Amino acid sequence: MRLLTLLLILMFALVAAYFCYSVYFYGGRWIANPYNPRISSQKQHVVMGTLTDRDGTVLAYTDESGTRRYNSNAATRKAVSQVVGDSSGKVSTGADTFHAQYLLGFRSSIFERLADAFTGTTQRGDDVELTISERLSRYISEQFPRDKRGAVVVLNYKTNEILALVSMPQFDPTDMDSALADEAAGALVNRATQGLYPPGSTFKIVTMASALENLPDLNDFAFDCTGYYPVGSYSVTDGSAHGVQSLSDAFAHSCNTTFAALSQDLGYEMLGKTAEEMGFNKNFMFSDLIVYNSSYPIDDLSAEDLAWSAIGQGRVLATPLHMALIASVVANGGVMNEPQLVKSVTTAQGGNRALLSHASSKRVISADVAARLESEMIRVVKSGTGRRAALDNGYVVAGKTGSAEASNDKSVGAHAWFVGYVANDNAPYAICVLVENGGSGGAVAAPLARKTLQKAINLGL
């Protein structure tokens, strides 16, 4: 009986410990529900804190009347709209709602609240400094192809800070009636974190990593690309016949048939394992933001399904942020780190609020494989499909283009992708550019990546 009692006590303690852990690390997700009555209640007696970008530009604040206000510049408001959100909580993934735990004072200590009560001071929430750059975000918004949807993500792969998280189209938080009336346009959706797209040839980074990790003698690998590769009852095709190629040649030319053939040697178990190590099918429970889960089919795939998956088509789906993280993995020598959106939190008294941990990191590929991938991605930009992403002045860009077929009830198009990073220690920027139905990744996404990376360098972020 005593043993049973001890077991019950231990089980209760474990459940309580897990509950406390969940509240501390993921409590923001519970609080962030716009229908949470605690949020509306807290807004009645707490002055909501200020949101700024990394340079101190005010993105949102509360005026003397208690009304939530946003930056006076319309271009700025729109450029950061999905990151900041709105006062009504319609964009529940925006910082105004998701970080209400800070902004509305939920993390204030009992001593801070007692001090406010004794002095008769209205409680004020914490001020939150985000890692994004308003200047970079606005520049990306201006350069993005007009009337196109998509997203651009820029990360500092050394610090894990998100420098830009731009989604198109955008909305104005001061005019939510228009945003809601035009909801079909999807401006309230953050495509950088919530948009799930076939990654196309950018997924060849994952397939290449899997081959390097699992297949022997790849230095002697050669494949004769005739322009099509029959597999099952289908054929995987290329725009032209590349002839006999090494694996390095095939990656630089983004040869679909070579990677389709490579998938048959790998099999779905090895390729699926690498994809999952890289974050596919994983639950992204990040501290600072909500990111939808990318997917890779891991059931017993047919030969043709496996071939399509190896080139990022079929049932493979990823968010632009995830693909930027994959670029960061290569840049970081095979380690994936948790992205950071909150740079600092300051209390009403001027003190520093302890941040939630951003220490989550995991080795997902070996350092040797990452080094080989970097050299292959550099070749893509120097002489392959990503030449339009190249920078001058000694900056070396490593990258991969993609043109992912996508269809709806009305038409079939191609999403333009570029995924890569600057391989210089003094400019540690990783990037993902996605232009929905933009066509060629090399022609559309790569030039925007080049402009964006150059702007980040010029700003000294």
Sequence positions of predicted segments:
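Beta-lactam-recognizing serine transpeptidase/beta-lactamase-like catalytic domain environment
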Residues: 55, 115, 158-200, 206-437
